[in-house]
Structure formats: C-alpha cells, structure tokens
Amino acid sequence: MDQEPIPSSLEDNPQFKEETSLQKFRRRFKEEPLIPLGCAATSYALYRAYRSMKAGDSVEMNKMFRARIYAQFFTLIAVVAGGMYFKTERQQRREFEKMVEQRKAQEKRDAWLRELEVRDKEDKDWRERHAAMEAAAKEAGKRKSVPEQDAARSAIEPADEKSIGVLAAVRELLARQN
C-alpha cells in the first residue's frame, strides 16, 4: 500500500472512514488480491478433479488433487504474508473503529444528558408555576374581606337587587356584624 505517514488524527484522514460491508469487501480485495486468487485456483482444481473423476481419468484426478493442495498452500501463504504486511494498518483501523464507537457512545450520552436537562428545566418551571399559583390562591384567601364583598355587591344593578331576597339580606347583616 502507499507509504503515507501515520495520521495524527484518524478522523481527518479520508482513508479511515466508516464503510459498508460491500465497501469493506472491495477494500480487502484490493489490499490482498492473492487470497481470492488462491481461493479461485483451489475451487478450479476441485472442479477439474470432479470432472476427471466423473470421466474416470484417475491420473488427471490425482494431478488436480495435488494442484488443489498447492493452491491451498498458496492461499495460506498469502493470508500469512498479507497479515504480516498489513499488521500496522489493521491496528490503526481497529483504533479508528474504537474511536468511532466511543464517539457514538459519547454522542448518545450527551443527547441523553441534554434530554435530562430539558426535562429538569420543564419540571422546575412547572414547580415554580405551581408554587406561584398556590401562593396566589393563599393570598386571595387572606385578602377576602368585606370591602371586596361590597365591591362585588355594587356591581349588581339596582333592578337585580330586589331579587336577592330576605334570607340573603339577613346573612349579609350578620356577616357585617361579625
């Protein structure tokens, strides 16, 4: 691969980004093309051995089984050599994936904390409104006095005064005396 220096911040390097499974397959295929080549050679040797067996050609079948063994050996060597060659890059990729997971977890935690703060603020606002309403109700209960009743009584029109009745008038007189 390229001999680029190790990036100081993996997020700034476009080489390290989140990828889909198809992108990952393509990238791995480009990084280590010998492994799929070895797998294809092994499959082809097995196919040819099968055809030779069906045809009854034991000499060709034995050659193809040997070719399969050589192809598998080639694939194994490609895997080991590729693993050694791309070791540092894989470590960087693992570190990057850990950082991405940590970033996602941190974003999720931050969103959760923001939601808790909003709920806490709403709760405090509700408690303040509730306390203010209770205080206003207590204040209104303390302020209820005779002048207020007289003010309410004066709002009644003179034509409606006659319909108050004797019982209400007696209660009003008793309330004024107390």
Swiss-Prot record:
GO cellular component, one term: mitochondrial membrane
Transmembrane segments: 33-49, 69-86
Domain of life: Eukaryota
Keywords: Membrane, Mitochondrion, Transmembrane, Transmembrane helix
Pfam annotation, one family: HIG_1_N
Compartments where located: Mitochondrion membrane
Membrane topology, as annotated: Multi-pass membrane protein
Similarity-based family: Belongs to the RCF1 family.
Oligomer status and interactors: Associates with the respiratory chain complex III/complex IV supercomplex.
Biased composition (Basic and acidic residues): 136-151
GO biological processes: mitochondrial respirasome assembly
HIG1 domain segment(s): 6-97
Originating organism: Aspergillus clavatus (strain ATCC 1007 / CBS 513.65 / DSM 816 / NCTC 3887 / NRRL 1 / QM 1276 / 107)
This protein's name: Respiratory supercomplex factor 1, mitochondrial
Region annotated Disordered, chain positions: 136-157
Role, per record: Cytochrome c oxidase subunit which plays a role in assembly of respiratory supercomplexes.
Residue stretches in coiled coil: none
